Amino acid sequence: MSLSVGYLTPKQLLIWDCRRRGLQQASIAKELQVSRQTIHKALNIANLKILESLEETARINKIKVQKVNPLRGFLLGYSSHFKTKTLITFSTKNGIQIWYKHEGDCKNCEQLKECKETLIAEAHERDISLPEDCLPSDYAEKLFAAITGGKK
């Protein structure tokens, strides 16, 4: 268990992901062949660990917390150091990721492919459709608006 996976056990991560995808606790319990109480307890623990992981990541990076949602796996904040909005996400595929709002020069960036793959994986895991052949900066705008409930 590490910060990058929210200090969750594999079972807690699975249960949290099922709930994040919209499955009811009773359905998760049936699928995993355990009691609803077991699922309820595991979800409470998972949400607390994710909340603590998101807040710890914000604290380490000196990000002022504005909104946090452990069930959906995100923290919205502001970086005084970079003077920009910041989004910290938690997902089963990417773990903890920090995203700073900025005007990217994606075409000239060495990490273009890596950023694009990470953003597409984040969107796929959250059932958010993105257009094809966009730059990572465009994906990020659309994805983060969808995650935080903003407009884009």
Question: Model regions: which residues?
Answer:
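Short Lys/Arg-enriched helix C-cap and helix-to-coil transition segments
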Residues: 50-66
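Low-complexity intrinsically disordered segments
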Residues: 130-152
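Helix-turn-helix/homeodomain-like alpha-helical modules used for DNA recognition
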Residues: 63-136
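Short alpha-helical "recognition helix" segments of helix-turn-helix
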Residues: 26-35, 39
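Helix-turn-helix DNA-binding helix
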Residues: 39-40, 46
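Residue-level signal for the short linker/turn that defines the boundary of a DNA-recognition helix
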Residues: 22-24
